[in-house]
Amino acid sequence: MLIKLLTKVFGSRNDRTLRRMRKAVTVINAMEPEMEKLSDDELKAKTVEFRARLDKGETVESLIPEAFAVVREASKRVFGMRHFDVQLLGGMVLNERCIAEMRTGEGKTLTATLPAYLNALSGKGVHVVTVNDYLAQRDAENNRPLFEFLGMSVGINMSGLPAPAKREAYGADITYGTNNEYGFDYLRDNMAFSPEERVQRKLHYALVDEVDSILIDEARTPLIISGPAEDSSDMYRKVDKIIPHLIRQEKEDSDTFQGEGHFSVDEKARQVNLTERGLIQIEELLVEQGIMEEGESLYSPTNIMLMHHVTAALRAHALFTRDVDYIVKDGEVIIVDEHTGRTMQGRRWSDGLHQAVEAKEGVDIQNENQTLASITFQNYFRLYEKLAGMTGTADTEAFEFSSIYKLDTVVVPTNRPMIRKDMPDLVYMTEAEKIQAIIEDIRERTAAGQPVLVGTISIEKSEVVSHELEKAGIKHNVLNAKFHAKEADIVAQAGYPAAVTIATNMAGRGTDIVLGGSWQSELAELENPTPEQIAQVKADWQVRHDAVLASGGLHIIGTERHESRRIDNQLRGRAGRQGDAGSSRFYLSMEDALMRIFASDRVSGMMRKLGMKPGEAIEHPWVTKAIANAQRKVESRNFDIRKQLLEYDDVANDQRRAIYTQRNELLDVTDVSETINSIREDVFKATIDAYIPPQSLEEMWDVEGLQERLKNDFDLELPVKEWLDKEPELHEETLRERILENAIEVYKRKEEVVGTEMMRHFEKGVMLQTLDSLWKEHLAAMDYLRQGIHLRGYAQKDPKQEYKRESFAMFATMLESLKYEVISTLGKVQVRMPEEVEAMEQQRREEAERLAQMQQLSHQTDENEAAEAIAAQTGDRKVGRNDPCPCGSGKKYKSCHGRLS
């Protein structure tokens, strides 16, 4: 109550921010007459003037009023479009490291030109980040005339571009590209073998479009570049044949309960667990198939990999559904993004899950992958000096933006008042009743000439609705991952009178639905249209536009609630753009996933008791409140998972930055001989100390062992025993010096054979190759450590602290191994001719190219590990003997981890 009163008196933080910025808008508006008087050349010259002022020490902030006024005037001349005052506000929000929430249709693309121009003046580059290649190309081409008019260059960073073209795109003042491509380029740059292979500059300013989709929805999926590991496809096929023999255990209170099954499914945590009966059954089947020996246990240490195959196969069958989580096209399993409904060509699930799904679908199984480099979007975007973003729906996630990215959210007012009518949800008992009600609603609205957009959460659901519409004889378009190429055309015409469009989730995001359809796309179909034809197309569009407005504008139908309120709001936001009329309604059933998992059984019980007749809907604030609570629960859980993922990745991030900094320094220098000499001294000291401990008696020395080690690991044949026999006065310090002197002498002779320049080149190549090889092994070791670390919770230890401690120890060991391996390799490799170094270099290049071609850009399912880690932290709470084991196995505690204690 008190907070509401204070907000009323002083205004919210959002109001105060906008009040401050409106003063600057007044200044920009006052400059407009002055800018209008400038000739085109004088307006263009302003860019050169601003850059000169920055060089003299002025700040970017001091240029805001004048720079924004210049961009607004240039936009009027190039596009015939003038930035509204609210767009100037949005531009200022984006310049202040904030998230700007701007409603659909408020011109986010034009707003972005203001901060992009302002921050590109420093010459350090601006990255505009979009969710797909189509939007990156569209926005770049649309804004190119404006930026080029102002003397700025524009680049497009597309996937699949060769390195020189990418370097050129990054060298531009303003670069457009997708979040994935920027992230993968960063990883690839840190795998380069020469400075010329790198494409990115220093990360200066990122302006993220649809920021909620990229920084929140995608934050659970790290970017991973991986290469092929050993082939185990045969095992996936064998294990896959066993899974259909297993029976899923239903809940005891369900109608289909038939006693204990073989495995249980936790839909909330996306986990599958074997029951006691299931373990016995699967062991018998594995023995029958000849995969496991009689009397062996699936949980024995020798069967760890087999357990991995069984778990992956169970998850593939029980949790992943064709046409919902993936599609099969041309004999290939392609992931469908759960957030956008788009197919993700080239992305693969990790942990053997993708191979298990391939075995299930009977397509060719591709090899498992080994991680070569990885980073989360959270850590990638925090590398930028300055980060900002815009979206139509950010306010529900403001806390997360603030706590993880240190970005405040500012809600920018609309240019015209919003008049869309959002109707309450209708809840039906069954899915079939709900679909029937949706069809009737569509029939009534299209009869009145009103366009309808139906939002579904999966390809499967969109095809069910499509099938029912076909039966009802209603013409419609389907927009889902299967028809990706036609996406923009379908969205452009979704505002036609009586048009019906079915869209998966947020497909078509970033393209406005114009009431009456898009006259631009009609013109694009005409070859060299005459002025009369253009006028006719526009006149026809105006008639259609007015007819749609009269019928009530675009109507949105949601076929079920999404896990996140934000994505529901995005669907609603497709209607009512720029003050147009519009309406929306969600249709739900008690069989929907969200209702089934989170809304309690009491709701369905209550509906049955009320004596609801088939086809009847319930519309009550209690139900709406129950749904909102369920969504809040899911959002809170997903936030915990993302936060957990980030806390673990922060540990790896510190190590990644240290390695990448070291690697880039190594790439930029030509002579690493000083470093080699320094680490040679460290390596030989440690090696000699292992056989001749400091300040020890001669009886404790293992001279023969030392001689053998020097010969085997460094190809150094030194008569250490002979020296000691002939010179009794030799003590450990002088002996160490003599061994080192001999090692340096042998190395110098090797250098004389190939020449100094070639040797420096060779040293650098060996260091890079060794660093990459050990870093790759370290990443795999970190993955294994991560998978089991949550079990430390049973020992009352904090898994995160344990992970930090152990991974640091592993990192320190890796650095020591790096020194040893480099000196050992340089000592053992016999180089007799300069051509041999060239040949080795060529071989390394070919191997790097081969790996690059086989690299996978994969989509990791880290949320499961994070969920496990959350679940395993039991603290001091005592687990009862008959309680379910906290590890999620489905067994009682006494039969699982309780037995161990």
From Swiss-Prot:
Intracellular or extracellular location(s): Cell inner membrane; Cytoplasm
Compositional bias of kind Basic residues: 891-901
CDD domains recorded: DEXDc_SecA, SF2_C_secA
SUPFAM superfamilies, sorted: Helical scaffold and wing domains of SecA, P-loop containing nucleoside triphosphate hydrolases, Pre-protein crosslinking domain of SecA
Homology family: Belongs to the SecA family.
InterPro entries in the cross-refs: Helicase_ATP-bd, Helicase_C-like, P-loop_NTPase, SEC_C_motif, SecA, SecA_CS, SecA_DEAD, SecA_motor_DEAD
Gene designation per UniProt: secA
Protein name: Protein translocase subunit SecA
Enzymatic reactions: ATP + H2O + cellular proteinSide 1 = ADP + phosphate + cellular proteinSide 2
Cofactor note (record): May bind 1 zinc ion per subunit.
Cofactor field: Zn(2+)
S-S bridge residues: none
Membrane topology: Peripheral membrane protein
Binding site for Zn(2+): 885, 887, 896-897
Positions with a binding annotation for ATP: 87, 105-109, 512
PANTHER family linked: CHLOROPLAST PROTEIN-TRANSPORTING ATPASE, SECA INNER MEMBRANE COMPONENT OF SEC PROTEIN SECRETION SYSTEM
Role description: Part of the Sec protein translocase complex. Interacts with the SecYEG preprotein conducting channel. Has a central role in coupling the hydrolysis of ATP to the transfer of proteins into and across the cell membrane, serving both as a receptor for the preprotein-SecB complex and as an ATP-driven molecular motor driving the stepwise translocation of polypeptide chains across the membrane.
Top enzyme category: translocase
Primary localization class, coarse: membrane
Keyword match Membrane: yes
Chain intervals for the UniProt region annotation (Disordered): 853-901
EC number(s) reported in the record: 7.4.2.8
A GO BP annotation: protein targeting
